[in-house]
Amino acid sequence: MRECISVHVGQAGVQIGNACWELFCLEHGIQADGTFGAQASKIHDDDSFTTFFSETGNGKHVPRAVMVDLEPTVVDEVRAGTYRHLFHPEQLITGKEDAANNYARGHYTVGKESIDLVLDRIRKLTDACSGLQGFLIFHSFGGGTGSGFTSLLMERLSLDYGKKSKLEFAIYPAPQVSTAVVEPYNSILTTHTTLEHSDCAFMVDNEAIYDICRRNLDIERPTYTNLNRLISQIVSSITASLRFDGALNVDLTEFQTNLVPYPRIHFPLVTYAPIISAEKAYHEQLSVAEITSSCFEPNSQMVKCDPRHGKYMACCMLYRGDVVPKDVNVAIAAIKTKRTIQFVDWCPTGFKVGINYQPPTVVPGGDLAKVQRAVCMLSNTTAIAEAWARLDHKFDLMYAKRAFVHWYVGEGMEEGEFSEAREDLAALEKDYEEVGTDSFEEENEGEEF
């Protein structure tokens, strides 16, 4: 089997984990205690779901997941929540003191005490796998645990499991909805440290999700539960091909092969459609062409940036539900003719398609309408560099005055690490810029000298 192990780090990671596993259980007909429900026999013609769940001797299904936080409160909610019997108690790991929004605490002082225990639990999970495919790591950029501990964990996973893929689902700090003043510091430090260890990172910008909840789902004041349920739909779409049989299936390494042209340029933009409330869905025909087209609208994106200003390097369309290849080909052809999508000139074709016949499931009492088909688009576009530019600018404003730096240095970090990380991100922005310049322009430049 091709197993995937999910690691949920810090408050954001764990809470998104809750939403994701709730949805996965619904999709696979697994009840809150890990046993199969009445409908399950219908669903289980295929056993692809064992990529995410392991089965115990007495027929219970346990997620292949670890939840880690350096302070106990968030994981305690899991321990006392609806799904408390789903997880093995050893899969829920907590420390005693939190990282206090401080990357240095998560990476050096406090994180160091928990890392071996976490790796030991991950080792137990990997030992139970026959063909481990890789790791999915859920975390935020802004928190201390999410940034610091994740980067420490990624370094150690690279050591222990060198060739296995590591995909991140990272919560990008939202410009409007900030939870900590030092988010830009943490984000840039963690990006710098994990850049060489991560194979592919799907960024989700809280503000973009807020806007989608307000605009498409008519939720005036979205809560984290609303956001996380939406994020879990996206994670579900990206991982559906790993958990169900389909016509055109995509596995973890295939994502990388098709989306990452250069090792550092591994931040695809995620777009999902249709995001629609039950009242509206009742009156709309959401055809393949329509949902495909809405993927190219900036307001279905998970990160605020404008792809019309950038160029596409690769594009991966993951359909699920009632979709046939012919419709997809027609829809994509229409987009190529109608839309002004600019691909970089060294990558002319650029569309990869996956189709999965399992229609999207929704959480009962949730915000999303039950629809027959959905699509998740992963595109590698140079426009996402806008997101880095925003963060870098905020970092510069604070770092020019060396604001808050003493908290990091006090935890054993060197000040030089800040400037090193900032230089690395400047290089990343430059990389994106260079990838977007046309190859024939460069050739002409060379002749002038």
UniProtKB/Swiss-Prot annotation:
A single MF term (Gene Ontology): structural constituent of cytoskeleton
Main location, first listed in the record: cytoplasm
Top EC class, one word: hydrolase
Stretches assigned to coiled coil: none
UniProt-annotated location(s): Cytoplasm, Cytoskeleton
Gene Ontology CC: cytoplasm; microtubule
Post-translational modification: Some glutamate residues at the C-terminus are polyglycylated, resulting in polyglycine chains on the gamma-carboxyl group. Glycylation is mainly limited to tubulin incorporated into axonemes (cilia and flagella) whereas glutamylation is prevalent in neuronal cells, centrioles, axonemes, and the mitotic spindle. Both modifications can coexist on the same protein on adjacent residues, and lowering polyglycylation levels increases polyglutamylation, and reciprocally. Cilia and flagella glycylation is required for their stability and maintenance. Flagella glycylation controls sperm motility. Some glutamate residues at the C-terminus are polyglutamylated, resulting in polyglutamate chains on the gamma-carboxyl group. Polyglutamylation plays a key role in microtubule severing by spastin (SPAST). SPAST preferentially recognizes and acts on microtubules decorated with short polyglutamate tails: severing activity by SPAST increases as the number of glutamates per tubulin rises from one to eight, but decreases beyond this glutamylation threshold. Glutamylation is also involved in cilia motility.
Gene3D superfamilies in UniProt: Helix hairpin bin, Tubulin/FtsZ, C-terminal domain, Tubulin/FtsZ, GTPase domain
Superkingdom of the source species: Eukaryota
Catalytic residues (UniProt): 254
Motif range (MREC motif): 1-4
Record family assignment: Belongs to the tubulin family.
Chain's role: Tubulin is the major constituent of microtubules, a cylinder consisting of laterally associated linear protofilaments composed of alpha- and beta-tubulin heterodimers. Microtubules grow by the addition of GTP-tubulin dimers to the microtubule end, where a stabilizing cap forms. Below the cap, tubulin dimers are in GDP-bound state, owing to GTPase activity of alpha-tubulin.
Name of the featured protein: Tubulin alpha-8 chain
Organism field: Bos taurus (Bovine)
Gene name for this UniProt entry: TUBA8
